[in-house]
From Swiss-Prot:
SUPFAM superfamilies: HCP-like. Belongs to the PPR family. P subfamily. Pfam families: PPR, PPR_1, PPR_2. This is Putative pentatricopeptide repeat-containing protein At1g74580. PROSITE patterns: PPR. PPR repeats lie at residues 39-69, 75-109, 110-144, 145-179, 180-214, 215-249, 250-284, 285-319, 320-354, 355-389, 390-424, 425-459, 460-494, 495-529, 530-564, 565-595, 601-635, 636-670, 671-705. InterPro entries: Pentatricopeptide_rpt, TPR-like_helical_dom_sf. Keywords: Repeat. Coiled coil: none annotated. It comes from Arabidopsis thaliana (Mouse-ear cress). It comes from the Eukaryota.
Amino acid sequence: MGPPLLPKHVTAVIKCQKDPMKALEMFNSMRKEVGFKHTLSTYRSVIEKLGYYGKFEAMEEVLVDMRENVGNHMLEGVYVGAMKNYGRKGKVQEAVNVFERMDFYDCEPTVFSYNAIMSVLVDSGYFDQAHKVYMRMRDRGITPDVYSFTIRMKSFCKTSRPHAALRLLNNMSSQGCEMNVVAYCTVVGGFYEENFKAEGYELFGKMLASGVSLCLSTFNKLLRVLCKKGDVKECEKLLDKVIKRGVLPNLFTYNLFIQGLCQRGELDGAVRMVGCLIEQGPKPDVITYNNLIYGLCKNSKFQEAEVYLGKMVNEGLEPDSYTYNTLIAGYCKGGMVQLAERIVGDAVFNGFVPDQFTYRSLIDGLCHEGETNRALALFNEALGKGIKPNVILYNTLIKGLSNQGMILEAAQLANEMSEKGLIPEVQTFNILVNGLCKMGCVSDADGLVKVMISKGYFPDIFTFNILIHGYSTQLKMENALEILDVMLDNGVDPDVYTYNSLLNGLCKTSKFEDVMETYKTMVEKGCAPNLFTFNILLESLCRYRKLDEALGLLEEMKNKSVNPDAVTFGTLIDGFCKNGDLDGAYTLFRKMEEAYKVSSSTPTYNIIIHAFTEKLNVTMAEKLFQEMVDRCLGPDGYTYRLMVDGFCKTGNVNLGYKFLLEMMENGFIPSLTTLGRVINCLCVEDRVYEAAGIIHRMVQKGLVPEAVNTICDVDKKEVAAPKLVLEDLLKKSCITYYAYELLFDGLRDKRLRKKKGFTVVAI
């Protein structure tokens, strides 16, 4: 028989055991050992093990047993550990209960217990309650230590009061506490969080000058704050100071830098840093490569990310699920599902087991490519491999089906989800509601929302916004306003998207007074208008020729720091043009770039060119057209049509004909009306050759009636096609009968083909 097990042996075994329930089983089995009695150390080890893994019910049972067998005055450390474990799992009330029961069990809390519960409260956002605990500690005559002050400083920083934290830091010495690196870095981090860079940098320098011993792990926490904000330059400044103090960065430090560089999109810097680590050390680890691969994928550099996956393997590192899933998700989001599937195949060969995230990425990618059948097959494959789909995976597939108009299949999938014991979220219903609205079935979507409410799901703002947008798009404003009333009655505040949908619908169906009244309500409710809001209002005001009010609204945009865009000015310029104020429109057209720094676009030029051609000022229209070309703003089909029509109306057939040919050369298809207008003008001047050339060019471009395509014989088709085109133009009233007669004879006269004028003139 071997020597008996001592409590220290049992404690060591429990600490090494990874399974908390096996640790408890071993702990309980020792009760049967003759002469063995659990001590504070064995109780503490099993309680910490159970608490760490969240087995709180079992932990509480052991606590009860411990109180009966160990003196309560010795248990403060155990209670502190229990509070911390409850706090880590977000069970704040349970942590508070442990603290409050300490007195009851004759274990008087010291500063350590107060610090523990204050830390739990601050980390969970219960700042007022933490302050009350602190005041209670002071009332009981317990002197706070450096950790107490640090926790309070952390509370101040988390509530955006870094200057209050600094005052507390400066007062620590008068309270008998020596400032340490954690206290300093807490306040420095608070300053950086609130973008007080100068104060943060100054305090950091003061800390180094004070001779405080610098701990690299604490410094890394400070760097994490800055890297999260993407402020890598400030990190470099602090690191330079630290290196001069003889403290060298470790791999964790470099990983933070790489993460920060990737977050800012400075991928070249991140790649260079990884290269330096490979060559000079410390050698990159899985986290290093994961940070870089994530950054590259985020910036759509998927193939480069895959290169680093290969380098990672070559360095002897084993990619984890995060590595593979990041690259797979990147390829899928980039519309390269085939490459993602190849990565999956390679990863599986190397021992990777696809999880919910993998299947979600692939299914989402397939749905975006319209491959819904393959997405469904992949979903079923996942089920067959034992993957238990969660709500997110179901929602991904439901959304994909809905976007492809497969609402019935999406609804069946939602029902299947419920049958399998998964509770649909409001988002699940929102996907279906959105899908129905996109198909124009807004009343059906409204009915689904009523079903949703009957099942105990309350719509959120997104649900209401979908319905309001759907009804507003269909110009059913009474229904849209009814939804708004339901929304308000249930305490859901409309947002800018809600009001924009309503304003857009009202703009098209109601008087501008109703539009402006809704806008007034929006502002009174504290909802800030955005650019889209103002563009809708301008459209309404211009429609009713309220141009002074429209200009006033432009000034209001400036006061509200909302920058106008090309649509804003396009709406205003169009309003002035339709009101006959061409000078005002042109002044505004020039002002948009000079005063508002808004670049003109092709649609904006089209508006002003249209106005000048309507007034038969083709000289100005041609000048603006040339300006467009010089600025590399490509004219579109509408621009050419305006120029052709304008010159034909003013009798300048040569330029009208020139712009028509240029239009067709640039790949734009003129309307039959535009073609007919030029043909008529040419025929009036007896220029049958050019007019016939246009007909033949129409045949070459495939601008022919359907009857032409029924002629199989090539020779007959060549002869018949121009005549059929001509008859089609006459039938659709695009050419005059005079032009028809001239061209009918001209197209038959083979001698015309030999004349030089018949050839289409090159521009």
